[in-house]
Design a protein with these regions (language model features):
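Radical SAM enzyme core and accessory elements
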Residues: 169-242
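Well-ordered, non-membrane alpha-helical segments in soluble/globular domains
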Residues: 22-26, 51-56, 88-96, 120-125, ...
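Short, well-ordered alpha-helices that flank and scaffold nucleotide-derived cofactor binding pockets
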Residues: 27, 31, 129
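Catalytic cores of alpha/beta
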Residues: 114-131
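Acidic (Asp/Glu)-rich catalytic clusters
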Residues: 56-65, 99, 128-131
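Core AdoMet radical
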Residues: 4-20, 30-52, 59-92, 105-114, ...
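A structural motif corresponding to the C-terminal end of an alpha-helix
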Residues: 2-5, 62-63, 94-106, 171-184
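Flexible glycine/acidic-rich beta-alpha junction loops that bind and position SAM and/or redox cofactors
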Residues: 112-118, 135-169, 181-193
Length: 242
């Protein structure tokens, strides 16, 4: 009943693009010819079809550009480990669809954590080189993970933080050389003071190792294969060995 009064419809998590209620609401908007609504989404962009319905075809009915905030924390097998259930090939395909769509704009949101701190420049370079992120793109938001503390960048030992800092500087230089705006680069710069604001390896290393052991056992994955750059940090504690 409220659809005629809508100006903005913001669909947040879990994952709105695979919920029945979302499609019912979109159908009602179209049926009532209320298609001047600004649609905004938080999504992991894993699914653009639901029960054979293509969201892009529905979006074509709307006059205002659709805004998609894509939650992506890395690429390849690292992305699949960080967000369980992710299929990277599908994410790549859907990024291309978003880039190609005429009435859709998208912005990347990334959680900065121990999982991507030592390879963040590789992720940015991939996104930039494939034109998923350009100097004309909306700002790519980088969120500093605060909790759980044992998976934040604070848990990195000092020598690893030196590498993480180098990764941030490499990303800043690459973006600067390509003409990215200060607002784009500021997101990277804000991670520098955060990286060194706490040093928690000694108090959190056991919890970190227990968490990785739990994840690998539960999912049948291998942290050391996926994150060789962090492998030396992870040795199964004696209390968890067979």
């Amino acid at each position: 009943k409220q659809v005629p009064n809508f100006e903005i419809a913001y669909f947040a998590g879990g994952e709105p693009l695979i919920t029945e209620e979302h499609y019912m609401l979109i159908d009602e908007m179209i049926a009532k010819n209320k298609t001047d609504i600004q649609l905004r989404y938080n999504s992991n962009i894993s699914n653009f079809k639901y029960k054979k319905r293509d969201i892009f075809k529905l979006w074509h009915h709307f006059s205002k550009p659709i805004e998609v905030y894509a939650s992506i924390d890395h690429m390849g097998d690292k992305a699949e480990y960080i967000r369980s259930g992710t299929k990277w090939k599908t994410i790549e395909t859907n990024l291309k669809k978003l880039k190609k769509a005429r009435n859709v704009g998208f912005q990347v949101n990334t959680v900065y954590s121990i999982f991507n701190a030592l390879t963040i420049s590789h992720f940015y370079k991939y996104m930039i080189d494939n034109h998923f992120y350009t100097p004309n793109s909306p700002v790519w938001t980088l969120y500093n993970m605060g909790s759980p503390e044992h998976l934040s960048v604070h848990v990195l030992p000092e020598d690893y933080k030196v590498q993480a800092l180098e990764q941030l500087h490499l990303t800043i230089k690459y973006m600067s050389d390509l003409g990215f705006k200060k607002t784009h680069i500021h997101q990277i710069e804000m991670c520098i003071p955060w990286l060194n604001s706490k040093h928690t390896w000694h108090e959190n290393q056991l919890e970190f190792k227990e968490e990785i052991k739990r994840i690998d056992t539960l999912r049948g994955e291998d942290f050391m294969v996926t994150f060789p750059e962090l492998g030396a940090l992870y040795k199964v504690p004696k209390s968890l060995r067979p």
